[in-house]
Amino acid sequence: MKRILLSLSFLAVVAVASAQDDKFQKTMEQTITMLDSAKTPEDLTDVAAKFERIADAETTKWQPYYYAALSTLWIGYRDEKIDKDVLGDKADGLISKAVSLAPKNSEVYLLKSMSASLHMMVDPMNRFQKYGTDLREALMTARQLDPTNPRTFYWEGTQAFYTPEQFGGGKAKAKLMFEKSLELYKKFKPENSMSPHWGEEITKQMLEACKGE
């Protein structure tokens, strides 16, 4: 009888844990869909807040911290009037938590690179030495952790696109990176429904911008 009770108790615990995981996954999937369809900084602000609430409830999962940071960074890139340092600092805190939970994950290091770029945009001339180094180091770490991550080549191409040729950038260099990214997207399959999958459409748009020059 004791063994039966112990077995039933164990099964009950497993069932509860499974139900919680299912709820987490469903909530994440719904919020990721909202992120995919977000059009404005206001939309992204709402989505970022939702991911933060999920992260507060699921402190051992890296994905909600990742998506909260990604949403926050996208606000900074799309809203010209907003304080980019404030958003960058907020994203940095979220990224740090994601890194602590997934220290070998290419995607979270890509966000570190994106955040460095956002900080640098405030004053490119005076901040390039610090944040330019941070940007490149985080990007290279992301590439080393997963050489097949198409988003790392998209991001490298984006940096080249907006950097003059005399400083090592230019649209010819960017074009090569975007083409490489799209090659990898053809083979890319997200690990699961919560894995990052963004970037292909914007890469196509950036490649067309290179061809239009």
Q: Where in this protein do the model-derived segments appear?
A:
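A contiguous pocket-lining binding segment that forms or flanks enzyme active sites
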Residues: 127-165
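Amphipathic alpha-helical repeat scaffolds of TPR domains
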Residues: 21-34, 57-79, 104-123, 148-163, ...
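Canonical positions in the second alpha-helix
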Residues: 54, 98, 141-142, 181
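Helix-turn-helix repeat elements of alpha-solenoid scaffolds
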Residues: 37-50, 83-94, 129-136, 175-180
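Bacterial Sec-dependent N-terminal signal peptides
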Residues: 1-24
